[in-house]
């Protein structure tokens, strides 16, 4: 069956809800503090990611849809960081600034793939005047195909009933990711998307699928909902609608590494698909496929159109092969969570020969996963001259990715991969030739993180330069 993705580029979605900033501090720890019996973390990497309703908006934008985000923030660096991060991924922010409150921020400190502590910076926004939120919704209703209300019980949706009524009056479907057990607040919504535990907290424990359907249909009637989608983890999803047979969809997840933010992905894909003009059943099909992709990633993540297309066509992304830098970071984090040793090397790899193959096979034997970082065409030209590369970057990466020894291939634009290596921090950095370890780009960063640096020998008689010279001589002859 041929599956066509929705026309996401024509979809407009507004997300209103509790926005927050997720901060991550990473670093090694090798000693206990003399001040208290706690580990000392030497922070060497800091990451900031939009969370809560902001992650829903990112999921919508990652599909190519037009995403607008409305929420409450403080007037602080966290709000500015959120705005910048979201603007970078084409989310249009229209925050209501509340000078008396901080932007909700969650700071996590991690070392050796373990979260040591989480610090929350927040004050509930209950009691804040909701009128500015209502005004922003009203202004957008004529230009959107769906309204998402993302509830994390932080106060932005204190007036959720008024928001539902505004959208329904304009004929715009309202999708809500609920929080808590008071579903009366969501009366009249188009679709609620509770997970199974949230659903059972309202209707009671369900022993069978039939009980889920029976109690779900009663909930729809009690709260005048148009539909209910219960996400059931490894058992997939169940869509319930009045007058229609239940639609049960099995999970499409190949491997589950992290369910963080999966609900955000589901409601984001649902909204974008509906706003593109597809049916609710089709929206659930695509949302289920997207959930299967995102739980295979570490941390709050989004799904690209290519990943979604692969998933719905039965070619779910394996998490290996040619990757972007951001995709690689997620793949490496997942590998470390599985206890795998990550090896990294780099080079031009212009005309792949036996020496390259032997070298990469030997490098792979030193760990569980091998990353190959490849010079871009411009970088290669600067290093090797105007006649190089012979093979363009895309072809070089595809050939490398086809080798059994290579797990991940990524490119870099600079003359050296030092910045890239500093961002990945492999357990083992490998380089071929007659280098000294301290001369290798990225060695200082790897050592500082507790990793190793090793020089491997190349096979004698194998050289790209010699191959090119031989080809040129043969042409002359």
UniProtKB/Swiss-Prot annotation:
EC numbers for this chain: 2.7.1.167, 2.7.7.70
Residues at the active site: 264
Domain of life of the source: Bacteria
One GO biological process term: ADP-L-glycero-beta-D-manno-heptose biosynthetic process
Cellular component terms (Gene Ontology): cytosol
Reaction catalyzed: D-glycero-beta-D-manno-heptose 7-phosphate + ATP = D-glycero-beta-D-manno-heptose 1,7-bisphosphate + ADP + H(+); D-glycero-beta-D-manno-heptose 1-phosphate + ATP + H(+) = ADP-D-glycero-beta-D-manno-heptose + diphosphate
Any one Gene Ontology molecular-function term assigned to this protein's record: heptose 7-phosphate kinase activity
Spans annotated as Cytidylyltransferase: 344-477
Region of interest (Ribokinase), residue spans: 1-318
Keyword Nucleotidyltransferase: yes
Coiled-coil intervals: none
Described purpose of this protein according to its UniProt entry: Catalyzes the ADP transfer from ATP to D-glycero-beta-D-manno-heptose 1-phosphate, yielding ADP-D-glycero-beta-D-manno-heptose.
Family affiliation: In the N-terminal section; belongs to the carbohydrate kinase PfkB family.
Name under which the protein is recorded: Bifunctional protein HldE
């Amino acid at each position: 069956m041929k599956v066509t993705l929705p026309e996401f580029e024509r979809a407009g979605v507004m997300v209103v809800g509790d926005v927050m900033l997720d901060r991550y501090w990473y670093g090694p720890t090798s000693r206990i503090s003399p001040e208290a019996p706690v580990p000392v973390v030497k922070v060497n990497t800091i990451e900031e990611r939009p969370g809560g309703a902001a992650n829903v908006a990112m999921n919508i934008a990652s599909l190519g849809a037009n995403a607008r985000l409305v929420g409450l923030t403080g007037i602080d660096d966290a709000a500015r960081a959120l705005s910048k991060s979201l603007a970078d991924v084409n989310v249009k922010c229209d925050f209501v600034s509340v000078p008396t409150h901080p932007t909700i921020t969650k700071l996590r400190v991690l070392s050796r793939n373990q979260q040591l502590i989480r610090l929350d910076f927040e004050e509930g926004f209950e009691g804040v005047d909701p009128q500015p939120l209502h005004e922003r919704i009203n202004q957008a209703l004529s230009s959107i195909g769906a309204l998402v209300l993302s509830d994390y019980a932080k106060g932005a949706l204190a007036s959720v009933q008024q928001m539902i009524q505004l959208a329904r009056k304009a004929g715009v479907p309202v999708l809500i990711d609920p929080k808590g057990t008071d579903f009366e607040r969501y009366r009249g919504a188009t679709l609620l998307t509770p997970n199974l535990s949230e659903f059972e907290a309202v209707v009671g424990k369900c022993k069978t699928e039939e009980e889920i359907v029976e109690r779900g249909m009663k909930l729809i009637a009690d709260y005048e909902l148009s539909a209910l989608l219960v996400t059931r983890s490894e058992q997939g999803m169940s869509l319930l609608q009045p007058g229609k047979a239940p639609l049960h969809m099995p999970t499409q997840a190949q491997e589950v590494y992290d369910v963080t933010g999966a609900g955000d992905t589901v409601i984001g894909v649902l909204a974008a698909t509906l706003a593109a003009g597809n049916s609710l059943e089709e929206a659930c099909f695509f949302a289920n496929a997207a959930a299967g992709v995102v739980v295979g990633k570490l941390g709050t993540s989004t799904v690209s159109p290519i990943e979604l297309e692969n998933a719905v066509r039965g070619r779910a992304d394996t998490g290996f092969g040619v990757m972007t830098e951001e995709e690689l970071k997620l793949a490496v984090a997942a590998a470390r969570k599985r206890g795998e040793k990550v090896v990294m090397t780099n080079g031009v790899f212009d005309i792949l020969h036996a020496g390259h193959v032997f070298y990469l096979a030997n490098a792979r034997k030193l760990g569980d996963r091998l990353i190959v970082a490849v010079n871009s065409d411009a970088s290669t030209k600067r290093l090797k001259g105007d006649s190089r590369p012979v093979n363009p970057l895309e072809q070089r990466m595809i050939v490398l990715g086809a080798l059994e020894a290579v797990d991940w291939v990524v490119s870099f634009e600079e003359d050296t991969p030092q910045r890239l290596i500093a961002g990945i921090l492999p357990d083992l950095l490998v380089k071929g030739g007659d280098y000294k370890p301290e001369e290798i780009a990225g060695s200082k960063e790897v050592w500082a993180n507790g990793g190793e640096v090793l020089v491997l020998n190349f096979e004698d008689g194998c050289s790209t330069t010699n191959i090119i010279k031989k080809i040129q001589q043969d042409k002359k002859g």
